[in-house]
Amino acid sequence: MKVALPKGVFDIFPYITDAKHMWRHTSLWHRVEDVIHDVCGLYGFSEIRTPVFEKSEVFLHVGEQSDIVKKEMYTFLDKKGRSLTLRPEGTAPIVRSFIDNSMNQRDDNKFYYILPMFRYERQQSGRYRQHHQFGVEAIGVRHPLRDAEILALLWHFYSAVGLQHMQVQLNFLGGEVTRKRYDKILREYFLDHLSSLSLLSKERFNTNLLRILDSKEPEDQEIIQSAPPILDYVSDDDRKYFDEILSALDALNIAYDINPRLVRGLDYYTDLVFEAITTCRDHSYALGGGGRYDGLIASSGGPATPACGFGIGLERVIQTLLAQGNFTPLSSHKLRLIPVESQADSFCFVWAQHLRSLGIPTEVDWTHKKLKNALKIADAEKATFVCPVGERELVSEQLTVKNMSLRQEFSGSKQEVEQRLLYEIQNTSL
């Protein structure tokens, strides 16, 4: 029986040629990940890696009424009956690590991660049961300009990777004073419309009132649009804090829109919440989001510590880049040696190792196909340079390298070819 992938997961590999699955090409993922490392380094963030699975209670602080905890977690018992869960989101494990490793001894902790997440989600476009997320978490400082800096990093990443038509949507949920005031107003409003709400929103009315604003159910939309906006009820301190964030974004020319219905899907958010929205082919959708979560660390058993961060789904980022037409796979290797005859094998083996030591990515074609066929394969596999080696090259000590991209070639001694290859690789944008 043929083995096959489970539903909701996929392979990332370098030999994809059809447009539909091009987003799974290894080189595209490498390019996005390289941008992440570079941009996060510019802002002083360091990479953190947490285990694929955690004790299940780590994720209960995400919110027992959230969709993740209620129906999307991959939870299992180990051989000793302990409940463990595959990581469904990035923030809770980093909070656990922060507490476990006593990182509160530092005033300011800035992390980023690129990690797989696991959620048992309904099959739909852009949603996968294993997906990959880039996120940042800044723990220890509460300041409106720190929040603006997080948004600037988000915007910088989108610009650097090449995404177009981006906008950030913002809302401010406020602190304890604001939330208590607004909860009372919102409860009275939804109580008047309770009979018309969806079953899910009726459930949220008793468990997590604010999440009704996040409902996607058709029967809720008109009621939600008429709901009183939270920004009408924020305290003076909250309004001042939010205004300072907006002024900072204006100073950086970051495009934003205030969305008074935005609440996010996880229960731990306080104060600032945001989503990054793109428009592609007349369709708008979120590519990531986040906000401030000043109460999560204390509720997880750590010291009261402010924090802010975001998460971005990389599958949608790469798919959107391809849809916007400015993203193509990179060549998978720079130079391919083709020993035309078996007596050239040893030469190619030794020279390839020397070329690699010089920093020239090199592959050897050991299939001994006819040269015409070997060149076709090299072209199909996006080799940038090809160098056939046979008896003539060994005797004359003159080598010819074909530039497959430019359809040009150059010749010379081994040392001359090495210098030309180094120059070409350093000065060619692929």
UniProtKB/Swiss-Prot annotation:
One GO MF term: histidine-tRNA ligase activity
Xref: Pfam families: HGTP_anticodon, tRNA-synt_His
Keywords: Aminoacyl-tRNA synthetase, ATP-binding, Cytoplasm, Ligase, Nucleotide-binding, Protein biosynthesis
GO cellular component: cytoplasm
EC category: ligase
Metal-binding recorded as keyword: no
InterPro entries: aa-tRNA-synth_II, aa-tRNA-synth_II/BPL/LPL, Anticodon-bd, Anticodon-bd_dom_sf, His-tRNA-ligase, HisRS-like_core, HisRS/HisZ
CDD domains named among the record's database cross-references: HisRS-like_core
EC number of the protein: 6.1.1.21
A single GO BP: histidyl-tRNA aminoacylation
Positions of disulphide bridges: none
Gene3D superfamilies: Anticodon-binding domain, Bira Bifunctional Protein, Domain 2
Keyword Heme: no
Subcellular location(s) per record: Cytoplasm
Catalytic activity entry: tRNA(His) + L-histidine + ATP = L-histidyl-tRNA(His) + AMP + diphosphate + H(+)
Cleavable signal peptide: none
Subunit note: Homodimer.
HAMAP family (UniProt xref): His_tRNA_synth
PANTHER family, per the entry: HISTIDINE--TRNA LIGASE, MITOCHONDRIAL-RELATED, HISTIDYL-TRNA SYNTHETASE
Family from the record: Belongs to the class-II aminoacyl-tRNA synthetase family.
Protein name: Histidine--tRNA ligase
Species for this entry: Chlamydia abortus (strain DSM 27085 / S26/3) (Chlamydophila abortus)
Organism classification: Bacteria, Pseudomonadati, Chlamydiota, Chlamydiia, Chlamydiales
